[in-house]
Structure formats: structure tokens, C-alpha cells
């Protein structure tokens, strides 16, 4: 097997992927990738890419040849320039059935870290609020991501931010514990620091990261609920 590896490295020459992230394409990158093939591992291609959108610069990440936002969405506009209505909890969020967004605990400081919370009506709106050429990730796209990271039972740990959700963030997904806004009249904003919940493009389905669990979970919720959003390139 060792001889086979040596022959493969010699025949391949220089790698086309910077597997060790040092900025150089060399034999070391080939060895890393060959070892990855033999051990059925995975790696993340980190690119120095950003998206300038609605007066904010988003970090992005490539995982399994798919371009994801590495931050939660925070836009307040649709692609045509229309405003997404911001509704505070005591202004009737529970009884609203129109597209809307919110700041957790009505705090712009929270939004600066965790992004906005959106209801499903905003996600479903035909005007779209991801950058042009991007869309809200579907449940199947989250599932494909999880499978690439080793399966839903362990993917959450690799997706979670190490500061806010006790994960390893090996994937560089940077999943944040942005909490949620419940649709019930008695509950309000909940679980910042413990839960990261992300609407999918599938109606009422969201992906969930939890601080004390390694899995990526999928659940359903009333469309009035407020959750984070991640965009993915078309």
C-alpha cells in the first residue's frame, strides 16, 4: 500500500487543491488527499470569498463543492428593493401572517452577531431575499451537507461554532446559537446561546443545532415562527 501511495504521488505531481491550506500547491497536498481517500475522510475547501449584499459583507465557505454563507442572513430588503417589515414582539408578531423579520430581544447588537430572525412567510416570498444567484438552503441540501460530514448524527458537532454552541466547527459552517422567536403568544424570543435554528426552503421545515447534541436535527414549526436563514449558491 505504501508503494502504491508513492507511485500515485509521483504520478500526480502537484495537487490542484490546497489541502493543507498553506497557500502552496505541492506534494504534501497530494498526500493529504490520498490519505483522505484511503481513510474515507472529508475536508473543507476554504476560499477567501465574500459577498457584498445590502450594505453588509458576508463570509462564505465551500463545502463539498457547494458554496454556503458562513454567516446568518441579516438583510432587511427583498431583491427588488422592497423592505422586509421588521415587527417587534409586542407589535403583534404572533398574529402576523405576512413576511417579516425581527431582532432577537429587539436588540440590534444581537443581530450584529447572529443575524435577523425571519418568519417562513418571508422565506416563501417570490421576491427573494438571498443575493441574486443564491437561495435559501433546502432540507435536502442540509441533508447532503450532513452526509458529507459523516451523517446527521455527528454533523451538527462539526457545523457548530465553537464559541456559542460547543462544537468543533471543523466544517467552517460557523453555526451560531441565534435562538428563535416562537409563534405562540406566551413565549416570545427563546434559546439564544443554546439553539441555532435555520428555516429551509421547504415549507415549515427547519434545521437545528443544539449546544448539547452532536446531531443536525430537522423539525417543523408554524410559519409565524422566527428563525435564522442561511443562503446557498444556485
Where are these regions (language model features)?
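Sec-dependent N-terminal signal peptides
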Residues: 2-13
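Hydrophobic side chains within alpha-helical segments
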Residues: 6, 29-32, 122, 144
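Alpha-helical transmembrane segments and their juxtamembrane interfaces
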Residues: 12-13, 32, 129
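Alpha-helical segments with a strong preference for the paired helices of cellulosomal dockerin domains
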Residues: 19-43
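Conserved positions within compact, well-structured domain cores
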Residues: 43-234
Amino acid at each position: 500500500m505504501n508503494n502504491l501511495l508513492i507511485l500515485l504521488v509521483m504520478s500526480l505531481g502537484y495537487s490542484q487543491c490546497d489541502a493543507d491550506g498553506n497557500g502552496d500547491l505541492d506534494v504534501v497536498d497530494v498526500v493529504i488527499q490520498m490519505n483522505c481517500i484511503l481513510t474515507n475522510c472529508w475536508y473543507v475547501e476554504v476560499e477567501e470569498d465574500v459577498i457584498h449584499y445590502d450594505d453588509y459583507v458576508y463570509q462564505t465557505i465551500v463545502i463539498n463543492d457547494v458554496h454556503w454563507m458562513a454567516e446568518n442572513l441579516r438583510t432587511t430588503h427583498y431583491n427588488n428593493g422592497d423592505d422586509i417589515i421588521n415587527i417587534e414582539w409586542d407589535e403583534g408578531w404572533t398574529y402576523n401572517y405576512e413576511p417579516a423579520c425581527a431582532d432577537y430581544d429587539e436588540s440590534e447588537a444581537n443581530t450584529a452577531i447572529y443575524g435577523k430572525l425571519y418568519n417562513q412567510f418571508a422565506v416563501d416570498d417570490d421576491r427573494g431575499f438571498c443575493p441574486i444567484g443564491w437561495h435559501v438552503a433546502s432540507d435536502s441540501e442540509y441533508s447532503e451537507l450532513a452526509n458529507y460530514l459523516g451523517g446527521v448524527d455527528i454533523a451538527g458537532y462539526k457545523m457548530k461554532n465553537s464559541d456559542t454552541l460547543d462544537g468543533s466547527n471543523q466544517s467552517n459552517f460557523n453555526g451560531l446559537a441565534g435562538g428563535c422567536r416562537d409563534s405562540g403568544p406566551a413565549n416570545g424570543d427563546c434559546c439564544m446561546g443554546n439553539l441555532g435554528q435555520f428555516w429551509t426552503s421547504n415549507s415549515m421545515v427547519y434545521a437545528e443545532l443544539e449546544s448539547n447534541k452532536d446531531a443536525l436535527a430537522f423539525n417543523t414549526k408554524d410559519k409565524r415562527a422566527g428563525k435564522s436563514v442561511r443562503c446557498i449558491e444556485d
